[in-house]
């Protein structure tokens, strides 16, 4: 078995990941959109590349998103570091998706900030199951009795 060059191998990993891998430049324009992003959000790479991140950020949180995004582009620092973040997203068909993601600042050889990469995972089904489980537990426990209340 012959190993491929690292660049080719990295490209194959990005292309075949079931997670969305997205790169956006300093202006928030999508420059990379893999097959995982296509599956999660419903946009093909041809549709998404060249568009802003607004296509996946719900309108209700866009202002806050862009404030943070441009602050990071200006300062070159993200307060989230290696944290796993949770946010709602929006699909092409308008439906909501629950996402967990991490971000990395991407710089060129001279250290100039090029933009941000994000790896996103659809956790909608897991969150729905967790909510259903909590509702079942609450129903089984019944109304909580307060100390000193009549039985």
Model-derived features: positions:
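PAS/LOV-family and closely related PAS-like sensory domains
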Residues: 36, 45-49, 54-100, 107-109, ...
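PAS-family sensory domains
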Residues: 8-16, 39, 77-78, 112-122, 135, ...
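PAS/LOV sensory domain surfaces, especially short acidic/polar patches at coil-to-helix junctions
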Residues: 27, 31-39, 51
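Short hydrophobic secondary-structure edge segments in sensory/regulatory modules of signaling proteins
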Residues: 21-22
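Sensory-domain boundary/capping and coupling elements
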Residues: 4-8, 127-145
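C-terminal helix caps at helix-to-loop junctions of PAS-family sensory domains
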Residues: 16-17, 147
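Sensory-domain boundary capping and coupling elements
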Residues: 101-103, 120
């Amino acid at each position: 078995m012959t190993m491929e060059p690292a660049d080719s191998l990295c490209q194959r990993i990005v292309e075949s990941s079931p997670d969305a891998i997205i790169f956006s430049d300093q202006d928030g324009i999508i420059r990379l959109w893999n097959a995982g992003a296509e599956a999660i959000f419903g946009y093909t790479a041809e549709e998404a590349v060249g568009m802003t991140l607004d296509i996946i950020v719900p309108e209700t949180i866009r202002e806050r998103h862009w404030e943070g995004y441009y602050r990071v582009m200006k300062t070159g620092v993200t307060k989230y570091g290696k944290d796993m973040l949770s946010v709602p997203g929006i699909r092409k068909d308008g439906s909501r998706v629950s996402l967990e993601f991490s971000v990395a600042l991407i710089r060129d050889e001279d250290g100039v900030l090029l933009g941000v990469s994000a790896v996103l995972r659809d956790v909608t089904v897991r969150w729905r199951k967790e909510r259903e489980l909590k509702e079942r537990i609450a129903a089984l426990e019944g109304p909580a009795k307060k100390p000193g209340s009549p039985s």
